[in-house]
């Protein structure tokens, strides 16, 4: 799993691959609950999708550019564009469904 900053995120986005990005913060209890799910999906989809995290406290401008109003928020990208978004703690199947639909 990749921990993105602005530069690494923009580089990955430009590659156009399917991406799943978790916008989170260390103090966020729901984010901590979702963390293991994101990590297991990163392992499961390695080589097929880019899965990573953006710490909203460290990358506030990036979070604002995607109008993140609550965390955790997971945004899916393909061909450099947002294709879907899930907010809050969701079961793994919710993320798997979006990933599989767009592979």
Model-derived regions, located:
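Short pre-active-site segment immediately N-terminal to redox-active cysteine/selenocysteine motifs
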Residues: 17, 24-27, 70
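Conserved helix-turn-beta segment immediately C-terminal to the redox Cys motif
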Residues: 16-18, 35-54
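Non-catalytic, surface beta->alpha helical segment in thiol-disulfide oxidoreductase systems
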Residues: 76-103
């Amino acid at each position: 799993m990749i921990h993105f900053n602005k530069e690494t995120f923009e580089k990955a986005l430009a590659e156009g691959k399917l991406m799943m990005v978790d916008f989170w913060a260390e103090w966020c209890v729901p984010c901590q609950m979702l963390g293991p799910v994101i990590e297991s999906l990163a392992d499961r989809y390695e080589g097929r999708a880019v899965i990573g995290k953006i710490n909203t406290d460290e990358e506030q401008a990036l979070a604002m550019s995607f109008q993140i109003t609550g965390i955790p928020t997971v945004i899916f990208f393909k061909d450099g564009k947002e294709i879907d978004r899930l907010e809050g703690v969701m079961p793994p199947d919710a993320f798997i469904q979006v990933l599989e639909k767009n592979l």
